[in-house]
Amino acid sequence: MRVLVTGVSGYVGAALVPRLHEAGHEVRGFARSSERVAAAGVALDDVVIGDAVSGAGLGRALDGVEAAYYLIHSMEGPVDGFPAAERRAAHRFATAARAAGVRRIVYLGGLIPENGVASRHLASRLAVEEALLEAADEPIALRASIVVGARSRSFRFLVRLIERMPVMALPAWRENRTAPIDGRDTLEYLVRAGTAPADRVGGSWDIGGPDVMTYAAMIARIADALMISRPSVPLGLNLTPVASVVAAAIAGEDPALIAPLMESLEHDLLPRHDDAATAFGIRLHRFDAAVERALRDWELTEEVAAR
């Protein structure tokens, strides 16, 4: 099957390409920069350079494609403007996919709080999902929380914070819960979603990992994997606007990316149902094994100082 992977220079897109090749698919990539594709180590002869926000290159990228993976985000643009950019990109992609006759669209989005109150980041993910679910006959949206992997920006952010802060000052969100998922399991879901039978398509699936934990517990378990001790100080308030700037500086990350991610910590992010692994036939990795694998992969290319 001929498939398109958008965001092919990103963590998930770059890792997905070889998995799709192994499954026997013919893969085309879509990205904004050939330099970023090369830097990500993506081995693809067929890459269309374009921009989903403007629509440039989408027609050529989607031509002759049976299934498309939508892995695009715009969170590193202007802090106040990324939701509008993400919606614009999704609608342009949806229009181009309908025109090209794409049969299936697979989207990786984010878990939504049970109370429906979402951060800007998660509200934007939901708006993108809604646009894409109308764009093909067989759409599938996969909703994940934190993806644990060597190139996952959210995981790397947590590791760098734990490395560089001798004491972890944890706001009120420390007691909120989530279900982080191994990057390998995320990729397996994506591959299987591309060819899943008709009873799996047409809506969204929540793909959490098997271990539910508070954010405080997650930080403690990562610190344990790093073999370091990090005492924590509980704070009574959520100081996300200020804390995100400080945390981004400490971790060496872009504040435009970190601010919306930290806003998402202010709610429980748990799967609505636990049937996705059974439905897709996937055996999930436990959290500690996922962290250890991610750290080992990271150390192949870069020093993780605490180890």
Spans of model-derived segments:
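Mid/C-terminal beta-alpha module of Rossmann-like enzyme folds, strongest
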Residues: R2, Y189-P260, P271-R307
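SDR active-site strand-loop-helix element
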Residues: T6, F30, L71, I105-G110, ...
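A short helix->loop->beta-strand "cap" motif at the edges of active sites that frequently abuts
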Residues: A99-R104, A136-D137
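N-terminal Rossmann NAD(P)H-binding glycine-rich loop of SDR-like oxidoreductase domains
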Residues: V3-H25
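NAD(P)H-binding glycine-rich loop region in Rossmannoid oxidoreductase-like domains
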Residues: G29, S34-A100, G110-E114
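Oxidoreductase cofactor-interface core, primarily capturing Rossmann-like NAD(P)-dependent enzymes
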Residues: L16, A23, A40, N115-I228
